[in-house]
A protein has these predicted regions:
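Extended, well-ordered alpha-helical scaffold/bundle regions in very large, multi-domain proteins
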Residues: 210-226, 230, 415-436
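Mid-core helix/loop region of P-loop NTP-binding domains shared across ATPases and GTPases
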Residues: 138-176, 182-183, 192-204, 208
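Flexible phosphate/Mg2+-sensing switch loops adjacent to catalytic phosphate-binding sites
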Residues: 76-111, 139-153, 432-436
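C-terminal helical "lid" subdomain and adjoining coupling/linker elements of P-loop NTPases
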Residues: 182-185, 278-399, 412-423, 427-435
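Conserved P-loop NTPase mechanochemical-coupling segment
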Residues: 27, 109-151, 174-188
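Walker A/P-loop-proximal flanking segment of P-loop NTPase domains
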Residues: 1-66, 73, 79, 233-263
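Conserved P-loop NTPase catalytic core
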Residues: 100-123, 200-342
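Phosphate-handling catalytic cores of nucleic-acid transaction enzymes
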Residues: 2, 14-21, 48, 54, ...
């Protein structure tokens, strides 16, 4: 529809996973990775917090699937390849009409070390530094050569010598997952050592920001893994700002499509006018809110905004899915199936009788057996209705679409489950109105 192109990774017969893993995301060219990165407020906040003249560690806080690893990979590339990052910021500055983007200062003097800690490559954090810092081998020798005076963890003096030799940005993904899994007994007090060592790193990052930039990710702030860093008042990126919802929509569109930003507002408005007009009439939107509703539809295209909200705020929460990550998979599968055929994609396009429509991707995200069984019940209802009118001339217009929309809306939280006839009517309306 309107020449919209899915990214290559979503065009194969088998839909690939959408998870960004820090270790693999840092292996390719910076320009290629930044090409699939939308400059959300959280991305920009992270890059700014790691910039010159800043003096606080950075903590990315959020549950799985919210994009922490993607942001860390973007920061890694921004620190490692200033030219590519500056070009990326300049390009988006023009696209978004925000001159401040291209003025965002970037560090260009840091040795960047990144590690996905959940891969369990290292038992101790200092081993990462000793193994991968240019001055690490020398500093390991100092520490291990202290004999009876050797401390349980390397001292701040040893670390300061290392970072003075070569200023460093240390990017630690899945820090909480790693920390919580550490042994902590009298014989093997590894978690206590990690707790002490992260305190030393945090204090160096605060007191000597020209020597160390520390960036870690955690799932939540109520863990010991976070407490020592919290003491030095870090910059917290938590995906909850006032722009978060709008940014998430833009991120979804940019991650899914190569050219969504190039489709004009006039083209979209013309394409979806019939559907939006009927939606406004059926839902009885007040006149004062109608322009706002039309803007919402235009911004969310090719998806209906109420469908995105339904998936994001109700279904994925109710089914304990991994938020943005699973939403990308679901929408990619859905667009591949119906995107070229309908002016706007609604809940009615989650066809219960067609596995290509994104149903499988959605069910893969469902943790609750009750939700998984709802599709079986919906299919039985579909067959029952068809059987009831078999052998008669009674038409059943839009039957599959109506039951599909009702099924999807029934996956929502109990207090929000189901739909009235006007909502279902709006869901099945395409480029022409349907008689009430």
């Amino acid at each position: 529809m309107l020449g919209l192109n899915l990214r290559n990774e979503f065009q194969g017969r088998r839909l690939k996973g959408t998870a960004i893993e820090l270790a693999s995301a840092t292996q390719g060219a910076a320009a290629d990775f930044l090409d699939i990165t939308y400059p959300t407020m959280d991305v920009l906040k992270t890059i700014e917090a790691a910039g010159p003249d800043q003096g606080r560690p950075v903590v990315l806080e959020g549950e799985r699937g919210q994009g922490k690893s993607h942001i860390m990979a973007a920061l890694y590339h921004a620190l490692n390849d200033n030219e590519a990052a500056a070009d990326w910021l300049s390009q988006w500055s023009g696209v978004l009409g925000d001159p401040k983007l291209k003025e965002l200062p970037l560090r260009n003097d840091m040795h960047v070390i990144s590690e996905s800690l959940h891969r369990q490559r290292y038992k101790h954090l200092w081993d990462i530094l000793f193994d991968r810092h240019p001055h690490g081998k020398y500093c390991r020798g100092i520490w291990e050569g202290q004999g009876n005076n050797k401390t349980d963890v390397p001292s701040d003096e040893i670390l300061l010598e290392m970072f003075t030799h070569t200023p460093t940005a240390l990017v630690l993904d899945e820090y909480q997952t790693w920390f919580d899994g550490l042994t902590n007994t009298k014989q093997y007090p590894w978690r206590t050592w990690a707790f002490n060592f992260i305190q030393i790193l945090s204090e160096i990052a605060k007191e000597h920001p020209e020597l160390l930039v520390l960036i870690v990710s955690v799932r939540n702030g109520g863990t010991d893994a976070f407490q020592q860093i919290q003491r030095v008042n870090p910059v917290i990126v938590d995906f909850k700002g006032p722009q978060a919802k709008h940014d998430r929509l833009r991120l979804l569109q940019h991650r899914l499509f190569e050219n969504r930003m190039q489709v004009s507002e006039e083209q979209i408005t013309s394409t979806i006018n019939a559907h939006v007009s009927e939606y406004i009439r059926l839902i009885n939107v007040p006149p004062a809110e109608q322009d706002h509703v039309r803007r919402d539809f235009c911004e969310a295209w090719p998806f209906a905004p109420h469908m995105i909200q339904l998936l994001e705020d109700q279904v994925l929460i109710a089914t304990h899915a991994q938020e943005t990550r699973d939403l990308i998979r679901i929408l990619a599968a859905l667009y591949k199936c119906v995107g070229e055929d309908v002016p706007v994609i609604t809940a009615a396009d989650f066809r219960i009788d067609d596995d290509r429509s994104g149903i499988n991707a959605l069910l893969d995200s469902v943790a609750n057996q009750h939700h998984a069984k709802l599709r079986e019940k919906a299919l039985r209802n579909l067959e029952s209705v068809k059987d009831a009118v078999s052998g008669t001339d009674q038409p059943l217009p839009h039957l599959e679409e109506i039951l599909s929309a009702l099924w999807l809306r029934s996956l929502a939280d109990v207090n929000q489950a189901g739909a009235d006839k006007h909502t279902l009517h709006a869901d099945i309306t395409r480029d022409v109105s349907i008689d009430d």
